[in-house]
Amino acid sequence: MPEVLVVDDSKVMREMVVACLRPYPDSRFTQASSGLEAIEQLTLKAYDLLVLDLNMPDIGGIEVVEFVRGQDQLRSLPIIIVTTRGDEASRERALQAGASLFMTKPFTPDSLQGAARSLLEKAPAKALDEAPRG
């Protein structure tokens, strides 16, 4: 059962991402409204996929990607960046930091589902052990 962490400061956007991915069989979703909250969640629970915005009020998406890639237990966690920043510099920076895919808003449900399916099929069963960490 894929565990997905959806991080965006917009509740509407988080709900839209969840609605787009809900048809993915047996997925379970956790939502975070900031980069700091995302990092807290990532230290508490194992996830199979991280869907992340770049623009957030405290810790930005790039910094969250850098945190994930700096952790041995999280290094293989697939990350989809979903952002309004469609410029090439943002795309390059996100991918260089370690994002798996970069998508711009607006996106279609099919494109997000396809990206998630592709990454989940390639990923190891869990990026972390099932046990919570302290």
Residues covered by each model-derived region:
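Two-component/phosphorelay signaling modules centered on CheY-like receiver
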Residues: 11-30
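C-terminal output helix
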Residues: 107-116
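Acidic, metal-coordinating helix/loop segments flanking the phosphotransfer/catalytic sites
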Residues: 31-49
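The feature encodes the CheY-like receiver
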Residues: 57, 75, 87, 106
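His-Asp phosphorelay/catalytic-motif detector in bacterial-type signaling
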Residues: 46-48, 73-78
